[in-house]
């Protein structure tokens, strides 16, 4: 993973090409059909096969050129977790997205799958009626399949490039006005806290960042990842394993302590305030920002004030521009922002926004 913090960035260009080829795996015939219709509704995606269990999925991957597998967890014959390593071994570069219910068990298995090679997850509605009415689920499914499919092709020599995804194309237009001059990293900057924002592709990126950093004992770490409730609970557990640091969802009113990771809980914005000379965590259900709750911007705005700008921000892979406004407030207050580079980002939206702004 690369972080952009100095020099000149020259955004690349994209070309139209073949649709992302998908295998849908679910033991329910009805759910397979609904997932297939949802994905096939986008011209940039083609469902080339479906399977009712992990063993059948492995057979399909051997027969077909597939970019992305949407993989159910609980199935007869062979479940998703058993099939996962065999699918990855059968076709190097294959992107596997776990389809999980919004339960503690489902979230736990999904995070475990990501730590074992899956690239992402989609929280799956529990009934056909929910899928038919859940526009958010459909958008999430399509965007993740296209993002990961395109990322897999970029990293795989000799394969056809993916048809560009509309949000990504918009970002290209926004950021392709010429070379971008970035700020130099201050040599004597000493932050009092670290803040990380991420979205699509974030869990994988977060695990890598914390594995590389190891224990951070002299400051707190604040993480806002676009993720639903329950999943953020499990994310915190995996960040603790990756970093060797205590990590948990933030609790409203708890004092901030150095050497801990605070994760924004799903459906809550996470902020920090100074009260009685100490820094205190706060959670709120104020309206979503950038269509997200939790959002990165509220966290960064609060940190710019609470820490008088002594904040180091890492903006990791993610769609949209959440965190760009908050990052400007951090920089204006004297803080520093580093962004994941385009080559290693699944979606260069959030890091691209701060990079293009020269932050």
Where do the PLM segments sit?
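Conserved acid/base catalytic micro-environments in cytosolic active-site loops
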Residues: 1-23, 29-44, 55-70, 74-359
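Short beta-strand elements in bilobed, periplasmic/extracellular small-molecule ligand-binding domains
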Residues: 46-48
């Amino acid at each position: 993973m690369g972080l952009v913090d100095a020099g000149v960035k020259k955004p690349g260009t994209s070309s139209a090409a073949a649709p992302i080829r998908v295998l849908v795996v679910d033991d329910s015939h009805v759910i397979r059909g609904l997932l297939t219709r949802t994905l096939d509704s986008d011209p940039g995606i083609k469902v080339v096969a479906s399977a009712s269990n992990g063993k059948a999925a492995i057979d399909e991957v051997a027969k077909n050129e597939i970019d992305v597998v949407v993989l159910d967890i609980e199935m007869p014959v062979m479940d998703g977790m058993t099939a996962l390593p065999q699918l990855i071994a059968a076709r190097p570069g294959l992107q596997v997205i776990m389809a999980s219910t919004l339960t503690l068990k489902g979230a736990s298995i999904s995070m475990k799958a990501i730590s074992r090679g899956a690239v992402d997850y989609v929280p799956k509605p529990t009934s056909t009626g929910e899928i038919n009415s859940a526009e958010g689920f459909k958008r999430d499914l399509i965007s993740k399949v296209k993002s990961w499919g395109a990322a897999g092709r970029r990293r795989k020599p000799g394969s056809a490039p993916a048809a560009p995804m509309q949000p990504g194309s918009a970002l290209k237009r926004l950021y392709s006005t010429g070379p971008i001059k970035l700020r130099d990293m201050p040599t004597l900057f000493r932050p009092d806290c670290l803040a990380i924002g991420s979205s699509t592709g974030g869990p994988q990126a977060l695990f890598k960042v914390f594995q590389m950093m190891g224990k951070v004992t002299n400051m707190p770490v604040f993480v806002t990842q676009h993720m639903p409730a329950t999943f953020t609970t499990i994310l915190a557990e995996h960040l603790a394993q990756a970093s060797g640091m205590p990590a948990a969802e933030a609790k409203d009113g708890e004092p901030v302590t150095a050497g801990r990771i605070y994760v924004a809980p799903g459906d809550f914005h996470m902020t920090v305030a100074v009260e009685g000379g100490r820094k205190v965590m706060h959670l709120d259900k104020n309206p979503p920002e950038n269509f997200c709750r939790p959002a990165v911007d509220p966290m960064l705005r609060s940190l710019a004030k609470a820490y008088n700008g002594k904040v180091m921000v890492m903006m990791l892979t993610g769609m949209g521009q959440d965190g760009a406004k908050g990052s400007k407030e951090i920089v204006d207050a004297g803080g520093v922002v580093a962004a994941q580079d385009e080559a290693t980002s699944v979606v260069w939206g959030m890091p691209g926004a701060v990079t293009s702004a020269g932050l």
